[in-house]
């Protein structure tokens, strides 16, 4: 089991549940917009939020932001050690730095500030920060991250989170497998510069999913260009699919000419309405009753289309026939019954 660190009220590592992170896209000093975006991320299920700190104005904004949010905040600093210290002084729950960009004396100052507040430091590497280059780039990536760790250890600092990220899936997997054998610190997983839409989802799901199945990884961020809320939704779905997080899983048939309902939109509507449920339940959306009920019998709850309506079934047993406009309402009714049953 990996050692644990505490980020605000969230524990990373040490057998704690894998947490879902994201990063704001706003200018941090724009406090109102940053808080608004973080609140949207909180509602989606984000558990740790990271903000970019590029100047003193950003660092000083952290205190005001923290007053209005519920989740821990991580300050991301690239070069200036003074911004790291200022972020810590203003209440950051964790900082992310690159120790290799700082002199020994300046790193000592940052470490002293972090120790004084009892907060962890995240270090690591991506392909842009590789210190040496050989024919095995994944290993260069991992060794660069380990060098960052050693710099902190030399200063007597051990509340560390480590990340190694590449835009290449195999490099990300190999590098994380390598460092998992070398250190006991918690590992932050992600695929950097993963891209947009489906490309980012596919790459992140493969790399993060593979590593989590091997029991590697303690916190995740799914990088998707655009609205960060989608990062959180996909991250939670990865954990639910792997059985690492409770929640509603919606399964749906791929549709064919027999479909009597709009399977895609129905499934999306159900996901949106039941995404908040924190119980392990499976809901099936099947286009027809020909194979639908049989294929969806493993679901806790389901709907199958009819020419003039739909049938609702619970654990493979048909409960009632309804018109299409009442499907969601009746599903909610049976879902509440299932939730009451689970609570008993």
From Swiss-Prot:
Coiled-coil parts of chain: none
GO biological process: isopentenyl diphosphate biosynthetic process, methylerythritol 4-phosphate pathway; terpenoid biosynthetic process
UniProt catalytic activity: (2E)-4-hydroxy-3-methylbut-2-enyl diphosphate + oxidized [flavodoxin] + H2O + 2 H(+) = 2-C-methyl-D-erythritol 2,4-cyclic diphosphate + reduced [flavodoxin]
Keyword Coiled coil among record annotations: no
Cofactor note (record): Binds 1 [4Fe-4S] cluster.
Annotated residues for binding of [4Fe-4S] cluster: 253, 256, 288, 295
Cofactor(s) for this UniProt protein: [4Fe-4S] cluster
InterPro entries, per database record: Dihydropteroate_synth-like_sf (IPR011005), IspG_bac (IPR016425), IspG_bac-typ (IPR004588), NO2/SO3_Rdtase_4Fe4S_sf (IPR045854)
Enzyme Commission number(s) from the entry: 1.17.7.3
Pathway(s) served: Isoprenoid biosynthesis; isopentenyl diphosphate biosynthesis via DXP pathway; isopentenyl diphosphate from 1-deoxy-D-xylulose 5-phosphate: step 5/6
EC category name: oxidoreductase
Keyword set, alphabetical order: 4Fe-4S, Iron, Iron-sulfur, Isoprene biosynthesis, Metal-binding, Oxidoreductase
Gene3D superfamilies xref list: Dihydropteroate synthase-like, Sulfite Reductase Hemoprotein, domain 1
GO molecular-function terms, A-Z: 4 iron, 4 sulfur cluster binding; 4-hydroxy-3-methylbut-2-en-1-yl diphosphate synthase activity (ferredoxin); 4-hydroxy-3-methylbut-2-enyl-diphosphate synthase activity (flavodoxin); iron ion binding
Pfam families: GcpE
Function: Converts 2C-methyl-D-erythritol 2,4-cyclodiphosphate (ME-2,4cPP) into 1-hydroxy-2-methyl-2-(E)-butenyl 4-diphosphate.
Recorded family membership: Belongs to the IspG family.
UniProt name for this protein: 4-hydroxy-3-methylbut-2-en-1-yl diphosphate synthase (flavodoxin)
């Amino acid at each position: 089991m990996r050692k644990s660190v505490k980020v605000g009220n969230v524990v990373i590592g040490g057998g704690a549940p894998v947490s879902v992170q994201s990063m704001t896209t706003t200018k941090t000093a724009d406090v109102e917009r940053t808080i608004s975006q973080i609140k949207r991320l909180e509602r989606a299920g984000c558990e740790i939020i990271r903000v970019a700190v590029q100047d003193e104005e950003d660092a000083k904004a952290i205190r005001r932001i923290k007053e209005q949010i519920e989740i821990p905040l991580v300050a991301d600093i690239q070069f200036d050690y003074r911004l790291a210290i200022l972020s810590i002084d203003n209440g950051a729950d964790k900082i992310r730095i690159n120790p290799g960009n700082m002199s020994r004396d300046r790193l000592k100052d940052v470490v002293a500030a972090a120790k004084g507040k009892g907060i962890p430091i995240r270090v690591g590497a991506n392909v842009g920060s590789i210190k040496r280059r050989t024919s095995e780039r994944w290993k260069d990536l991992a060794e660069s991250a380990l060098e960052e760790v050693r710099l902190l250890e030399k200063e007597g600092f051990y509340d560390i989170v480590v990340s190694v990220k590449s835009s290449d899936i195999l490099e990300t997997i190999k590098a994380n497998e390598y460092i998992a054998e070398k250190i006991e610190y918690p590992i932050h997983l992600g695929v950097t510069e993963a891209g947009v839409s489906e490309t980012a989802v596919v790459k992140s799901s493969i790399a993060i999913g593979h590593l989590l199945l091997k029991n590697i990884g303690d916190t995740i961020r799914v990088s998707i260009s655009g609205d960060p809320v989608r990062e959180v939704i996909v991250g939670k779905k990865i954990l639910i699919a792997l059985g690492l997080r409770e929640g509603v899983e919606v399964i749906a048939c791929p549709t064919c000419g027999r479909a009597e309902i709009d399977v895609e939109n129905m499934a999306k509507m159900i996901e949106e309405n039941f995404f908040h449920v924190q119980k392990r339940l499976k809901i099936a959306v099947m286009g027809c009753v020909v194979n639908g009920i049989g294929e969806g019998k493993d679901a806790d709850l389901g709907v199958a289309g009819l020419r003039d309506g739909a049938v609702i079934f619970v654990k493979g047993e048909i409960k009632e026939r309804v018109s299409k406009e009442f499907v969601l309402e009746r599903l909610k009714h049976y879902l509440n019954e299932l939730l009451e049953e689970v609570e008993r």
